[in-house]
Amino acid sequence: MSPSKKKVVVLGSTGSIGESTIKVANDLSDRIEIIGIAACKSDEKLISQLKETGAMSACLTDQESAQRASTNMPDGVRFFHGEEGLIELATLEEADIVLISIVGVAGLRPALAALEAGKDLAVASKEILVMAGQAVMETAAKNRAKVLPVDSEHNAIFQCLEGKESKDAVSYTHLRAH
């Protein structure tokens, strides 16, 4: 019996990490399904990604971009806007994992909302861990959710937040070439 598909929401889908996530999901379509995507201003790219992924929920945080995109949304897509829209996506009932790849502090409230809803959180925004690492980890523990660091820098911060000594755990770190 094959495991069920992981349903993923990508907050920051038009950035490099978001685009890479969509590519991986397409390559592993038997195991990963993108169900929601969000961006700040890239309305045309977001609409293209909706068509590519088949995601049925989307958000643009920039009001002007959201207004432009609202008339071009594919049929049946639930369309949200603003920070509240990010929170709506992060707490979609059907989501298993929420990837936060939003730059800066804008991802904090959606990250905490996802964890409070019991969603596993993949963190590609180190600001969230630096700013509110203890709150993130406590919220995850309270709701039996996992926090998954996406790259080496976040993994190092995550290990510090876990409070484990280096001899207690061995961790594989993925290094990216720039």
Can you name each region flagged by the protein language model?
Residues 16-21, 45, 105-111, 123-124, ...:
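Short glycine/serine/threonine-rich phosphate/pyrophosphate-binding segments
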Residues 173-178:
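Conserved small/polar residues in nucleotide/adenosyl-binding loops
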Residues 14, 50, 98, 118, ...:
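Residue-level signal for inorganic ion chemistry
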Residues 60, 78-83:
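Short acidic-hydrophobic, aromatic-tinged amphipathic segments that line or gate anion-handling sites
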